């Protein structure tokens, strides 16, 4: 678990997220690089890093996915926000398969807001290690703990299958 990832670590997080989504059947995952704003602002390092990651992914792909960012949360989920802001993104309004937060604090806050306000059911795992590791909140219920274990089992089976087929 990386609290404030650098660029190399962010690439690994993106690759691990894309791989996890592929294990669940997503052919070409669309990942949003979450930021406070959708415009590159040199005073906001995460916007600069998001732009750089998208550029590097286009030039020398480091993950099997589509990458978009920086993008604000409202634009990730709302077509109306994209229309009002005149923001042209083919996946705005719910078309993204995953959201990459700029740091652990942002990710934790986002997931906890889903749990409390949207009554979401979540699962948690550390991916990118030798084997997936189930990771839940201290307040996770039995269902979330179970789903975290199922997630890890599916991901591990997919990784073993890829390895047997000679894929990375």
Functional labels for PLM-detected ranges:
Residues 1-93, 97-101, 106-168:
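Anion-binding alpha/beta catalytic cores of soluble intermediary-metabolism enzymes, centered on
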């Amino acid at each position: 678990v990386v609290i404030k990832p650098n660029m190399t670590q962010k690439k690994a997080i993106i690759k691990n997220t894309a791989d996890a989504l592929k294990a669940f059947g997503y052919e070409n995952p669309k990942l949003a690089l979450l930021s406070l704003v959708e415009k590159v602002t040199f005073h906001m390092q995460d916007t600069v890093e998001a732009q750089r990651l998208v550029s590097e992914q286009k030039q020398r792909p480091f993950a099997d996915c589509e990458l978009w960012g920086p993008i604000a949360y409202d634009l990730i989920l709302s077509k109306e926000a994209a229309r009002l802001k005149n923001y042209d993104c083919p996946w705005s309004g719910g078309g993204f398969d995953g959201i990459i937060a700029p740091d652990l604090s942002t990710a934790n806050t986002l997931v906890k807001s889903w749990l409390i306000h949207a009554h979401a059911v979540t699962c948690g795992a550390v991916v990118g290690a030798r084997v997936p590791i189930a990771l839940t909140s201290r307040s996770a219920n039995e269902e979330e703990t179970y789903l975290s274990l199922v997630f890890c089992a599916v991901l591990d089976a997919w990784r073993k299958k890829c390895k047997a087929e000679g894929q990375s």
